[in-house]
């Protein structure tokens, strides 16, 4: 009776009907986030009086913290609360921070404005910690692995999920920035708060349609057990026929009997062989009941191997994420000093150029999903056309090339400023059309279509089934670390250039050398790309175990 009820629930719940509710929620939430982040440097420099470099570092630090909290949120989701409850709880925390924003520029006294504003930002960061890693995985959970149709739909889901995020950010950039700069910051922040309220209401409406995964205990404990068990048996021979396969029968029973979660057995691999010792049954294990800190199943060991394989990939993506931070910082200040007029009366706000990234992505993702993938699939026979790692690699190359272009455009802007005697006139517009910035914004969009979506898919698909919120948190955390690295690069460049008598990143960009800074980023990206290509070439993809399999892997 319970099995038939479970089957009916799986048929009536989940799928696109459920995922669409969560996608709409993400659109509203991302509208709020990008409505704040995309023009934050303007608020910090113009309203709070911070220098360009200080504002850039503050933004990078805030984004970095926002992207590190998800590790805690993912732990709570996978081990204690479950993804649904975590998303709901942290959405209210996020709303609290958002509500504090308009209060900081209206009710709060001017001398306290900066403190309250940054308090609001970091309360938002706490809320982001639970929302970010769980909402995407919760949406992806609505597509099962056992159903072939739903499994195929999941590949398209990641494309359209990112497309929804970009749609939200584009609307925010086009609408909110004009309100913030032309009407008032308090109205702009109030609209942001309203969008979060709408997101929570929509999320609650969709409750009857959701498939909810049950938390299975601390994933970190399972990882620690494998490490400890392998260390305890480091002297033993890891001969293949000594594996403790009897414990896999327990996992198979778990797979058949669990109604809410589906746990699949992993194929054994030859990588990280030292961990295989955790599965060996020695004399102590024969004579006593199983101690999970001495004896682990093959499946548990393979789960740890999945995580270890992703660590080098994670490291190789840090510089790409450091590059992304330029979009919300120096790109804006660069555009603010160029000719942005249309006709005689209309001037484009610098932050509005970020919508070009969104438009590029909104055009490319449907083309990628409906044209590129089917065409390439005929050649590669891969269900996604190209692998996640190949997709990421293309994006990394585009990002590296883009920073070279950024440096060239900035070098030309500086030359025009010198030719017109504007070196010491930072408030004067350099007579160079802001359309010169189009290539770098378009290339950011192209790079994101390949790398960001590829990262989301890789860190979801290659994580153990019970640790997918952790996988999303790991993906988000690399963005956070990239933001911290960007802050470190800015500080290092400031220190070194100042010691040589010519500071590269001063408030007056006509006296700065933003072009040199961009080329340093390009060089670091090139090194990172080479490291990534080496790691990706030796990466083993996850493969599920067939009944008669011994050791399987897919490169």
Curated annotation (Swiss-Prot):
<feature type="transmembrane region" description="Helical">
    <location>
        <begin position="470"/>
        <end position="490"/>
    </location>
</feature>
<keyword id="KW-1133">Transmembrane helix</keyword>
<feature type="transmembrane region" description="Helical">
    <location>
        <begin position="392"/>
        <end position="412"/>
    </location>
</feature>
<feature type="transmembrane region" description="Helical">
    <location>
        <begin position="435"/>
        <end position="455"/>
    </location>
</feature>
<feature type="transmembrane region" description="Helical">
    <location>
        <begin position="348"/>
        <end position="368"/>
    </location>
</feature>
<protein>
    <recommendedName>
        <fullName>Protein NRT1/ PTR FAMILY 5.4</fullName>
    </recommendedName>
</protein>
<dbReference type="GO" id="GO:0071916">
    <property type="term" value="F:dipeptide transmembrane transporter activity"/>
</dbReference>
<feature type="transmembrane region" description="Helical">
    <location>
        <begin position="159"/>
        <end position="179"/>
    </location>
</feature>
<feature type="transmembrane region" description="Helical">
    <location>
        <begin position="87"/>
        <end position="107"/>
    </location>
</feature>
<feature type="transmembrane region" description="Helical">
    <location>
        <begin position="187"/>
        <end position="207"/>
    </location>
</feature>
<dbReference type="InterPro" id="IPR036259">
    <property type="entry name" value="MFS_trans_sf"/>
</dbReference>
<dbReference type="InterPro" id="IPR018456">
    <property type="entry name" value="PTR2_symporter_CS"/>
</dbReference>
<dbReference type="GO" id="GO:0042937">
    <property type="term" value="F:tripeptide transmembrane transporter activity"/>
</dbReference>
<keyword id="KW-0813">Transport</keyword>
<feature type="transmembrane region" description="Helical">
    <location>
        <begin position="116"/>
        <end position="136"/>
    </location>
</feature>
<feature type="transmembrane region" description="Helical">
    <location>
        <begin position="311"/>
        <end position="331"/>
    </location>
</feature>
<dbReference type="GO" id="GO:0016020">
    <property type="term" value="C:membrane"/>
</dbReference>
<keyword id="KW-0812">Transmembrane</keyword>
<feature type="transmembrane region" description="Helical">
    <location>
        <begin position="62"/>
        <end position="82"/>
    </location>
</feature>
<dbReference type="Pfam" id="PF00854">
    <property type="entry name" value="PTR2"/>
</dbReference>
<comment type="similarity">
    <text>Belongs to the major facilitator superfamily. Proton-dependent oligopeptide transporter (POT/PTR) (TC 2.A.17) family.</text>
</comment>
<dbReference type="InterPro" id="IPR000109">
    <property type="entry name" value="POT_fam"/>
</dbReference>
<keyword id="KW-0472">Membrane</keyword>
<feature type="transmembrane region" description="Helical">
    <location>
        <begin position="18"/>
        <end position="38"/>
    </location>
</feature>
<dbReference type="InterPro" id="IPR044739">
    <property type="entry name" value="NRT1/PTR"/>
</dbReference>
<feature type="modified residue" description="Phosphothreonine">
    <location>
        <position position="86"/>
    </location>
</feature>
<feature type="transmembrane region" description="Helical">
    <location>
        <begin position="516"/>
        <end position="536"/>
    </location>
</feature>
<keyword id="KW-0597">Phosphoprotein</keyword>
């Amino acid at each position: 009776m319970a099995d038939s009820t479970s089957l009916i629930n799986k048929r009536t719940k989940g799928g696109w009907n459920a995922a669409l509710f969560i996608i709409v929620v993400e659109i509203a939430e991302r509208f709020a986030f990008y409505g704040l982040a995309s023009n934050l440097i303007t608020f910090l420099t113009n309203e709070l009086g911070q220098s360009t470099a200080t504002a850039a570092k503050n933004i990078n630090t805030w984004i970095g913290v926002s992207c590190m909290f998800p590790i805690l949120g993912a732990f709570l989701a996978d081990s204690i609360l479950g993804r649904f409850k975590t998303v709901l709880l942290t959405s209210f925390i996020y709303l609290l921070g958002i509500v504090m924003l308009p209060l900081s520029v209206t009710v709060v006294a001017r001398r306290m404005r900066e403190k309250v504003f940054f308090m609001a930002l970091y309360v938002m960061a706490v809320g982001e910690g639970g929302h970010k890693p769980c909402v995407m995985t919760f949406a992806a959970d609505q597509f099962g692995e056992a159903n072939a149709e739903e499994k195929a739909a999941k590949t398209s889901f990641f494309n359209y999920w990112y497309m929804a995020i970009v749609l939200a950010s584009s609307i925010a950039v086009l609408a909110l920035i004009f309100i913030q700069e032309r009407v008032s910051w308090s109205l702009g922040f109030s609209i942001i708060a309203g969008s979060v309220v709408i997101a929570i209401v929509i999320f609650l409406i969709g409750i009857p349609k959701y498939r909810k995964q049950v938390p299975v205990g601390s994933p970190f404990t399972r990882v620690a057990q494998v490490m400890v068990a392998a260390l305890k048996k480091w002297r033993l021979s890891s001969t293949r026929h000594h594996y403790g396969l009897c414990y896999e029968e327990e996992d198979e029973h778990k797979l058949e009997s669990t109604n809410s979660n589906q746990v699949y057995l992993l194929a054994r691999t030859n990588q990280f062989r030292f961990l295989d010792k955790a599965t060996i049954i020695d004399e102590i294990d024969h004579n006593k009941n199983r101690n999970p800190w001495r004896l682990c199943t093959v499946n548990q060991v393979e789960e740890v191997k999945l995580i270890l394989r992703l660590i080098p990939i994670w490291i190789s993506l840090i510089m790409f994420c450091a590059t992304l931070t330029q979009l919300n910082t120096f790109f804006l200040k660069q555009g603010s000093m160029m000719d942005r007029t249309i006709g005689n009366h209309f001037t484009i706000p610098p932050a509005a150029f970020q919508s070009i990234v969104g438009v590029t992505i909104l055009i490319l993702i449907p083309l990628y999903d409906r044209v590129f993938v089917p065409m390439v699939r005929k050649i590669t026979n891969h269900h996604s056309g190209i692998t996640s790692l190949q997709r990421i690699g293309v994006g990394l190359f585009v990002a590296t090339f883009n920073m070279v272009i950024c440096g060239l455009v900035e070098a030309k802007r500086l030359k025009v400023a010198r030719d017109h005697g504007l070196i010491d006139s930072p408030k004067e517009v350099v007579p160079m059309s802001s359309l010169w910035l189009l290539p770098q914004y378009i290339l950011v969009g192209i790079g994101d279509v390949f790398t960001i979506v590829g990262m989301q898919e890789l860190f979801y698909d290659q994580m153990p089934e019970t640790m997918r919120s952790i996988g999303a948190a790991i993906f988000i955390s690399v963005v956070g670390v990239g933001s911290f690295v960007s802050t470190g690069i800015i500080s290092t460049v400031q220190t070194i250039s100042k010691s040589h008598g010519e500071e590269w990143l001063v408030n007056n960009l006509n006296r700065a050398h933003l072009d040199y800074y961009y080329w340093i980023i390009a060089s670091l990206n090139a090194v990172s790309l080479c490291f990534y290509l080496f790691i990706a070439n030796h990466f083993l993809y996850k493969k599920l175990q067939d009944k008669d399999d011994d050791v399987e892997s897919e490169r």
